[in-house]
Amino acid sequence: MSIALLTFDIFGTVLDWRRGLRDALGGRLADDAFDRIVDRQGALERQGFRQYASIVAQSLVEELQLSPEDAARIGAAAGSWPLFPDSAAALRALRAIAPCAATTNSDLAHRAPIEAQLGFPLDGWICAEEVGAYKPDPRVWRAAAERMGVAPGPDWWHVSAYSDYDHATARALGLTCVFVERPHSRPGPADLVVKDLRELAARIG
């Protein structure tokens, strides 16, 4: 098994954004409300690039009727939302197998608090703010290829719980797609399906 690069979606795959958002709202977040927020964020991203924190904030104003001030505070703190329990140890193990990089629809400001939670830096970080586009836009993947020095192909594995954002474009580029069965994940065609990142590390380690 040849793996030259592992790239990861962050929000919803490495970071538990539903729990983070629920905690920020004082423990009140129904499943259908979360799904509406995710869908609204996707619609806003398709309208053109703007900082992810502002997209989070607008989706909360529109779907939950939060005040703009409260919504902006929550959006700015998104990088501090908790990791899934398996993420840090699994990513540490996976970095011993191949370079690990983030491809994320988030802001540069989110990198430091996320890596602080991990306890180590990832080998690369390709975020929407740098690229000026959101996944599934192919520009994100081209930026990752240039940054990491790896051409798209089957030895580049992309790991995500959101096939609609990630795997359609990744598969079109010839990447190996790994689907992670997180709560509220969005499945689609994948080359490998795992229940969490711990299982992925065990399967390919």
Regions flagged by a language model, labelled:
Residues 23, 46, 73-80, 100, ...:
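Residues at structural and domain junctions
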Residues 1-6, 18, 88, 92, ...:
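Asp-based, Mg2+/Mn2+-dependent phosphohydrolase catalytic module
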Residues 40, 96-97, 121:
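Structured helix-beta-strand junction loops
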Residues 53-54, 72-102, 112, 138:
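Short, acidic loop-to-helix structural element flanking the phosphoryl-transfer center
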Residues 3-85:
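N-terminal helical cap/lid subdomain that shapes the substrate entry/recognition surface
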Residues 32, 63, 69, 94-97, ...:
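Low-complexity, intrinsically disordered/propeptide-like segments
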